[in-house]
Structures are given as C-alpha cells and as structure tokens.
C-alpha cells in the first residue's frame, strides 16, 4: 500500500505557502491598517475586506473542501480516503484564529495523510509538534515556571495541549491519569512553540525553545522521565502511543466509526492484535478494521456522518458538486 496520489488536477498549495499569506494578513491588519485607519472605522472595515481577498482568506477553505471531496469521490482507493477522514477527525483542530482558512487543509494533507503509512506513534509525534496543533492548543503560550525564562517571568504553563494529548489523542481518561500527570505532561511539552519575530508574528516555524522548557525530571503515570530537552516529548509519546489503554481506546474508536456505535470485545480484539503484531503499523491496523467491518456488517447497522453519507451517495450514483479544478483558480489581487 502506498500514499494515494491526489486526484485534484489544480494547484495544491503547501502549508508554508498558505502560512505566508496568513502572515501577510495578520501583519498588514495589525501593523498597518489599524494604525492608518484608527479614526475611520468604516474605511478600516473596507480595507480589511480587501486584505482578506488579497490573502485568500475565503478562498483557501473552499479550495481545500474541493480537494477533499474530489479525492473522496474520484479516488481509486475510497477506503483509504475514509481512514484519512477518520484520522483528521481524531486529531481535529478548532475553528479559532483562522485555522480553517489557513491551516486545516494542509495539516490534513501534509501531516496526517503521509503518516497513515507509518505507525500510530509516528502520527502522534508529527501531529503533536505540527504548526496547526501547536497553535490550536496554545502551546506557544506555555512556559515552564522554573525555566530560564520563566523563573523571572509571570508567565506560566498552559495545559491545553498536554490534556488533549492524554485525553483525546492517546490513552483516554480510562487510564486513570491525575491532574498532577497533566501538569507533568505540560512541563514536558514546554518549549515547543512557534518562533516569534516582529515580521512573522505567530506564523513562524515550530521549534523547541530550551529557554522556556521546564528543567529536571518529570513523573507521568508513575514513570520517571529524565530531563532530556526536546527528546523528552518523543520519549513520552512513545510510551503513550504504545500503552494498552491507548490501543484499546483507538481500536474501539475505529470500530465505532466503521462498524457500530456499540462495538464489542470480539470486534475490537483483532484490531488490537494487529497493532501488537505490527508494532502499531497503521496500514496493518486499517486492514484489521476492514476485516472486522466486513465480517460484522450484516449484523450491525451504522448511521454515517452526514459528510460521509453524501460522499458515498455521490460515488454510488455518479454525481458531484465539486467545482472543476480550473474554476478554482484564484487571483490574489
């Protein structure tokens, strides 16, 4: 199995390319328009709308939906596309800070899709340190209180990213982690942030800022992790992504998505077995899910998500609402 080629014949903008437009929008708005038209609210609104058009704010999201739906309808591997949608939903990002316009599409295309050919651990690691997820969960605002920077600052930790990594992305609350575990996980993640500058603002590349990282060892769910800078996070992710509770949580969620809202142990067990035998290889896990879905489909009914249902109907009956690629060309002027 290989990464499925895109069926979209038009331009597919890169994450960095779109981020440059996002940077232009933020900088022009904050540093120029607000100052220039501070006494003329109507003119400011008018110029801001022109800036949105110039930087593709309303174009990128529509373009990404066209790429996504074209892929689902026309791909020669619809099952692969279904799994792509599943993982995009599992590692979802919010609608805040213009992320849908400037981040969601390339995040799903460049981070989630390629890692579907790797292990679950690989995917968790790459998602966790992606620009989209770091910004979605405000990890750039998380500063270790005893870090070189934090010890002389009033800034402190932000638990959002650590809590979501534990609760929604890996082991789930069923593992029984405590608030102390969340705090320790947050300490591990301090320092992972966008590289801020006067020109790039919050659109800089992700890096590990040791000056913001909480020093010393951390204890998470009873295990001590030695101080190891940026490698600390990868070590913890390795344990979380291969934890029995994580396997059970993800396998259950996969079966719930593809088979029934109430998956049984006999449905879930083969998926966990495939996980164990393959070291978490997602292609192997996906095959196990498909086998279970095929075996139990005649005895179970599953109400599809609206988007999934419409896309399936489009494939079955040969209709499409997706604009042709040449009609999605955009003039950034």
Give names to the regions the model predicted.
Residues 79, 83, 95-103, 135-138:
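Short, flexible active-site-proximal loops enriched in glycine and acidic residues
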Residues 4-52, 103-109, 113-333:
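His/Asp/Glu-rich metal/cofactor-coordinating catalytic motifs and the adjacent surface-exposed loops
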Residues 49-56, 60-81, 85:
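Structured, charged N-terminal subsegments at the starts of enzyme catalytic cores
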Residues 90-91:
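Residues forming anionic-ligand binding surfaces in small-molecule and nucleic-acid pockets
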Residues 56-57, 70-75, 95-100, 111, ...:
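Short coil/turn segments at secondary-structure boundaries
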